[in-house]
Amino acid sequence: MKAISVLGSTGSIGTQTLQIAEEFPEQFKIVALTAGKNLDLVIKQIETHQPEVVSLADESLLSELSSRINSLTENKKIVKKPLLMAGAEGLNTAAAWGSADLVVTGIVGCAGLLPTLAAIEAGKDLALANKETLIAAGPVVIPALKKSGSRLLPADSEHSAIFQCLQGTPWADNARLSTGMPTPGFKSIQLTASGGAFRDWKAEDLVKATVEDATSHPNWSMGKKITVDSATLMNKGLEVIEAHYLFGLSYDQIEIIIHPQSIIHSMVELDDSSVLAQLGWPDMKLPILYCLSWPSRLKTPWPRLKLTQIGNLTFKEPDTKKYPCMELAYSAGKSGGTMPAVLNAANEKAVELFLEERFKFIDIPKVIEAICEKHKCDLNLNPSLSEILEIDNWAREEVLDYSEKNITKMQF
């Protein structure tokens, strides 16, 4: 049985991870949970999974959580009260929890960086759903992985697809996972993108896009932030940077293809011109399950893919006019150093302000480009962790400042 720590248990990745644990109780045991403010859901998760430690983001909620757990303990719905913690200390403790074999990092954004590093330093394997950690701090995370021997298993569908295609190759047989070493034997990878909420919109119509429009994904069920990232194609741009670190590829070896059906999750082109692809229904539970069960596969009762029911699979090149964030991500990745951290932080803050209706959808790439341009003269090619955290904070403040001076609030 594999013991699992779930960081971000009430979010999209966290809840799906716990669903899998419930489906396979003989395979997985949940030993640690971290969550935000959704106490009702956390209580249900504690009752179901009986973890050893629980941490909340907000310390002020600990008293209420403790009281409610005491009641459940008295009623024998909880066998043993878990250790209760809060804040950064609790998050890092859960990430490095002694009995955990695997840590699922489902926290959105750069907030997942420090607990990811805590897990790595403790020698834990990670199921990485928090791509921003690797993007912002790849120069720190990759050396930490090499030092600890931890393995980074990609939990998003695209990188999981590449990872699955590489099983049995020299890369998988001879390398520690995710050390950034060059991948022998293949020419390139092709990351597929659904095209997001606006794939059928004309570029000139995006000026009218609302928050509701941007958070309505045609294929996937995800959180609001990543759904907006899908709509801008920044999500795919960030995945390009992640793939660079995961598989040791140059940016010229990583291609983005629009595939509206989201059935082919990504492809690997080998040196001999063969192409390997991983197919499946657009369901995040499958890549999460593969992380949890790897190197084994588990039999599931989930719906089977029947291509005859789908009929056609279509592909096209992304429209750079409609998706300027894609090119911003390639540029930041090629610049290296602290530039991806600036890109990531600026994007996170810009999306946050858009979701608050502080400015328009089309302003997201404008803000990000302005902040990245401003950082060029201060680019640090070999940053420390403290320098990455400092530049992350700087970029967020710059987005606020820029938006107040240059952006008009959404009005339709």
UniProtKB/Swiss-Prot annotation:
Transmembrane segments: none annotated. 1-deoxy-D-xylulose 5-phosphate binds at residues 131, 157-158, 194, 217, 230, 235-236, 239. Pathway: Isoprenoid biosynthesis; isopentenyl diphosphate biosynthesis via DXP pathway; isopentenyl diphosphate from 1-deoxy-D-xylulose 5-phosphate: step 1/6. Gene3D superfamilies: 1.10.1740.10, NAD(P)-binding Rossmann-like Domain (3.40.50.720). Keywords: Isoprene biosynthesis, Manganese, Metal-binding, NADP, Oxidoreductase. NADPH binds at residues 10-13, 36-38, 130, 132, 223. SUPFAM superfamilies: 1-deoxy-D-xylulose-5-phosphate reductoisomerase, C-terminal domain, Glyceraldehyde-3-phosphate dehydrogenase-like, C-terminal domain, NAD(P)-binding Rossmann-fold domains. GO terms for biological process: isopentenyl diphosphate biosynthetic process, methylerythritol 4-phosphate pathway involved in terpenoid biosynthetic process. Mn(2+) binds at residues 156, 158, 239. InterPro entries: DXP_reductoisomerase (IPR003821), DXP_reductoisomerase_C (IPR013644), DXP_reductoisomerase_N (IPR013512), DXPR_C (IPR026877), DXPR_C_sf (IPR036169), NAD(P)-bd_dom_sf (IPR036291). Its EC number is 1.1.1.267. Its cofactor is Mg(2+); Mn(2+). Belongs to the DXR family. HAMAP family: DXP_reductoisom. Catalyzes the NADPH-dependent rearrangement and reduction of 1-deoxy-D-xylulose-5-phosphate (DXP) to 2-C-methyl-D-erythritol 4-phosphate (MEP). This is 1-deoxy-D-xylulose 5-phosphate reductoisomerase. It comes from Prochlorococcus marinus (strain NATL2A).
